[in-house]
């Protein structure tokens, strides 16, 4: 097993075992190098992750999914995107589905990405004036986005917002908050 995947398993289990970070095994993690992205398979729980619980995908194919023109119908688009992501798998015979947030992991510059739903943060993001509160707590160090449907829509919106943030601040945000 690659050292990077051992580290990814360790990171996944660390956050997965702490119920302050995840609810019912939710959230997802990934590692990427120049060629491949390993992302948590749908239906896997972070606290018990093993090597086979990650889907290895070809990044060049994921980029084609990101750049493809899809229908404007949100439901049809997500069905098409999920089918296209399955075609990115290095080992399709494993019959594992990549996380619906795979594209979000791909657009991040970081090698390791941890996407969680901590209860306390969910409470904050579901509250009135959540954007104002996030800015009060974290200043300009984080990126805040209003509600966006998960999957393709959120990846495209976050990618655009990240570019704007980087242009304004000259560096990436320390964290990204997506409203619920």
Task: State each model region's role.
Residues 1-180:
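Glycine-rich flexible loops
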